[in-house]
Amino acid sequence: MYLIVAYSIAVHACYLGSKIVVSLYALQLGASQTAIGVLAAMYAAAPLILGIYSGRLVDSTGTRWPLIGGAAVMCAGMLISVFGHGLTALFATALLTGAGFMFFNVSIQTLTGGLGDKEQRARNFAILSIGYSISTFIGPVSVGLAIDHLGHAGAFLMLAMFTLPPIVGLLFSRRFNFINGEKNTDKNRSTLELLRLPPVRSVVIISGLIVAASDLFAFYLPVYAHTLNFSATVIGVVLGVYAFAGIITRFAMPLLLKHWRGERVMFACLLFSACAFAVFPLSTNLYYMLAIAFWLGLGLGCGQPLSMMIAYNRSPEGRAGEVTGLRLTANNVARVVIPMVCGALGAALGAAPVFWLNAINLTAISFVVWRQ
């Protein structure tokens, strides 16, 4: 399990770090906030199409080759911007990185959920989510330092190197070709059947909106901080503090789940996060910004692991990978639509309304969660 988490940390750090260097490099090239929003949406364009297919592929073939292929495609995406220049290269990087991470992420979550019984599954997802938090710290901080000291091409090269240990390790080990239960090879099953199940449908929608809020913070914080003339290193530190708070929350999550249902914990965390989003753009002081980023990390830190665990528990037998792919497809619908809307909003009114829109979004879905 710990080797799985180590590979996940490396690939997730590459994914998150690329979003920061792509947005900052685009700003340096003179891109508008609308263009930044389209770039953010490009990360979700291929996953939007491939999400359900990737889940079916994992259910039918196992997890090993989708893990290898996903990491390799991400490496190729980074190398495009090492050797290419301009917005065209950045769009290609965003497209390939999003596609590769989709296959890797569906596989790693299916593999994690398939290890052990239901009680062990909760522990495994908690460990995986801690890994995600660690990579959320490593990615932004390392890429901020790399941009300031090595330039944008150097940062992309560093991120490409993050993907190499998982690729090499998985190529030489067959331990990770795992699926929970019998391989599901029924070609006639319909994904619409899953959406007709209210427990699955609700967690899919909620997951998409939670991830969109988290991703928008990672993508629009650099835009907002850039207007305040913060360096890439400082921006990385702010995102690192946000990630560190998520690590704390995820260590505490098993204790919280012993006393309250997952849905109640998620309700409290989402409402807590909404308050942080509402006040974030009111501060231009770095120390206040660090404090609010920590506050936000405490709230959002539980959202994604809880949605992963709840979705897996609600999956029909033999279709866990497909439900994971469906959930990630919903995540990417939100990642396409919301960044483009927010990009246009930011171009017209500035970055602050983007944060306030997130606050409204999280408040609304927190009460949807409360009703379940």
Where are these regions (language model features)?
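Cytoplasmic helix-loop-helix junction between adjacent transmembrane helices
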Residues: 95-131
